[in-house]
């Protein structure tokens, strides 16, 4: 039996995966039993290459995907487990990854995840400790043997390497330029951080789907990787189309033109069943014709629907997909395209940018997002935090020689807190990402604290949770005006260090304790951070035995041990 990794590496066939949505309740519940029965039928279907199992889809509490996945895996079918960041912090995600590896689940779809919906006694608190980029980075490092401190010692040991085959989701089904381009840049970042396959988001525009394929094939950073792209096909019904129309599912859009067609066919005697199945089959044919690695079929809950869609697709002539590609183009009004339209095919022309977009690159103009606040902040930051400048050296000296190197001089701490709270609504996280996001705070202005590019949930440029413009769209506008928008994610993955919360981000940046700690001075002028919030009192809230808990060192560790940790690549200096 071939693994999903081997099948995608073969590149000679067109694969098919089916999404299995988990349920709320135990395996004793009727709905779980129906889902289990459907899974059994998928296992027996030779045309299905893998089964993909969701992780609390839509932010709803549901049965663990591993509970549904075990019988499928043990029956011999490949399983793709969704793993999202909304419900676990990094420790929980690492623990879940170890469990998956131990149970034989090696295929993982790394997701930031949907914002939590209503749960037990109300809405659950979102976690989003790390994002999909951070998760991919962690899984990639686990594949190489994750470094970890020995119990009670300063030296590092290496865990046994895992064998994860990690993928990610990407979307360009967005209306505005400052949504689409950051999504494409994040797609590159996901591949750079370990995504070995990409699944597109639900969408109904063949030209947009072709654009993503062209982008992956032509971008110098990722073209050589030849990462497989899998097209997303969702079986609509009249009710689902109306549900999507309300934009209840973040990132999924039904345009006016498509909705009108759905409503028209919903009035037929079969309530549009034939039309919706044909639409799904046509999308599969388009993906096959364009050269996608496979199709990802969602919205199906019966094997009869799967078989019907596949039968319809087999009935098409070899080149019918070309006409379907012209037909299935349902953008929203004034939607942005990255590439120019090829008039012969109706699809993307990878040799030409969309004319209006290309013109905007030649003559860059400021938008409302290029504010005076931004310009002043950038000027001051460059003067103080650029290594080697006079103010940078002075700042390092001041904070290094202050009584409390985590807070710095009291006057500067007051100035930092007052200015950043006023200008950026700073939450005092101590590991500041303002310079990474064009001086916009992800803690106060992003519902998911996304520090490595936007999530996929924006609606017409606005946050899926709060009704304001996405910070990554605003950051793109600022960086585009300066000609640096293509570099907005050209940095190591940002993984926030929670132990720095409540400390001075100025001190942490200047002394190389924050996520930017890869700077050359880190080894010579950094004190390794310990948990500054740990208590020295005994009892439940007190300091814990480092041997019993697995902590790298006691809170009152000798400074020489701290410096050994720095040189060993310990917690205060992230690996490249």
Residue ranges and their predicted role:
Residues 16-34, 79-91, 165-182, 262-278:
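Active-site mouth loops of central-metabolism enzymes
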Residues 16-20, 49-53, 79-83, 108-110, ...:
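Hydrophobic faces of well-ordered beta-strands that scaffold small-molecule active sites
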Residues 2-4, 136, 141-144, 301, ...:
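Extended, intrinsically disordered, low-complexity segments
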Residues 1-49:
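Conserved N-terminal beta1-alpha1 strand-loop-helix module at the mouth
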Residues 414-525:
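Metallocofactor- and cofactor-centric catalytic cores in central/energy metabolism, strongly enriched
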Residues 60-70, 90-92, 115-135, 147, ...:
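Active-site-adjacent beta->alpha loops and helix N-cap segments on the catalytic face
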Residues 90-99, 182-185, 239-240, 305:
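Catalytic cores of alpha/beta
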Residues 1-7, 37, 113, 126-164, ...:
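Active-site pocket-lining/capping segments in soluble small-molecule metabolic enzymes
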